[in-house]
Amino acid sequence: DAVAATEDIKSRLSQFGGTDLLAVGGDSAGGNLSAVTAQSVPDLAAQFLIYPTVDVHGDYPSRTDNAKGYFLDMETMAWFINHYAPALPEDEALSPLRGRFEGLPPAVVLTAEFDPLRDEGASYAAALRDAGVSVVHRDYAGMIHGFMDMDMISVAAKAARDDGIAELSKLLATLR
């Protein structure tokens, strides 16, 4: 659905504001959808991936280190993964880290220190960089999964959110 919606919007971009730049972005599972969309829809301007889930089968230290007690836990992640697409456990769309990276749009990837998804997000940023894709990766110390929605209750979360948005704004400014 994300790919189809993006292709439709891209085909009618002038109706939505008149520029020819279209970026995708999302957090957590939305980061997964955005990464898959960037791999599937050519000529996107940018991708903004916020603590994305990009490798459902990987084994990462952050999944052990942050498995419990930091808002998103691995028990909940297992439930999400088992219910997201149980008939397609090896589908590349579940793990875009195992997909292609050549020719992808530049990216801003945000991760959080105390997030089970931290290391896969960092690995995705590294894979983009290794493929020659321009990428800014920010790992926010002291932050947990979901910090982008915590700006009203945490000064540190607000600062991290504002920094991430500023990085995206800088990236988009270079494309105009």
Features from the language model and the residues they span:
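Alpha/beta-hydrolase superfamily serine-hydrolase fold, recognizing
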Residues: 1-176
